[in-house]
Amino acid sequence: MLNAAPSKIASDWLAGFCRALGENPRAAVDGFFLEDSYWRDLLAFTWNITTMEGRVAIADMLEATLESASPSDWRIRGEPTADGDVVEAWFSFETAVARCEGILRLRNGRCWTMFTAIKELKAYPEKKGVTRPLGVRHKADPNRETWSEKKRRQQAEFGISRQPECLIIGGGQGGIALGARLKQLDVPTLIVEQNERAGDSWRRRYRSLVLHDPVWYDHLPYIPFPEHWPVFTPKDKMGDWLEMYVKVM
């Protein structure tokens, strides 16, 4: 098996693990995971951000969540790669309520690390692509609202006829990104921030600050940075980007 192509190694492992998982979760972990293995879950199984270390913890998690999660339709996505004795592959699967994705790393034919995450809730798909808003009403209507009029009306109604269901404390990049996600799911959300303008949490820091992570790790949902964006973003440039993002999203 170890001399096979990475795609075959990953596909065979995933198919075998899925079969074994349906029969006996603990035996599946013992047979398909290294003793020194890790599984990090972002909501898909545990509805939490949780890291399981070692076979016992992984098996305990699966035994506790497998019935409610009901995972199915596991598939390798893209082309797996190999680096020495490690094979890396992206995969997708579904649970009872969500479409999910993950990445696994196999070492000597067994799982060394696995990451799983919810990508989309089945009952609450985001309004994008073919389901995006039309943005216009093609008929004569003297009471038609423009985009700006509708926005002002919704802002005036917020907190009166429509109450927030989620409160986000802090309007930095994390709070802003979460707010954008919740808006796409039509969840009324209030973000409270001590600074006057979006992005001020970056602008008000020391003069020479740039983001320590390169641009590829810093994208916000829906609007990635343009290709000419600097590798390390200056703080004031990041502040202006966040302010633009809030206005657009």
Model-derived regions, located:
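N-terminal FAD cofactor-binding segment of flavoenzymes
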Residues: 181-188, 194-216
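Glycine-rich active-site loop/strand segments that organize a redox cofactor
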Residues: 203-240
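A solvent-exposed, acidic/Ser-Thr-rich amphipathic alpha-helical stretch
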Residues: 2, 19, 23-83
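Flavin (primarily FAD) cofactor-binding/catalytic cores of flavoenzymes
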Residues: 117, 164, 187-194, 236-249
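Feature captures the FAD/FMN-dependent oxidoreductase FAD-binding
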Residues: 78-92, 96-109, 232-249
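N-terminal Rossmann-like FAD-binding beta1-loop-alpha1 element of flavoenzymes
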Residues: 156-191
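Short, low-complexity N-terminal intrinsically disordered segments enriched in polar/charged residues
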Residues: 1-35, 152-164
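Short beta-strand edge/turn micro-motifs at domain boundaries
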Residues: 92, 99-154
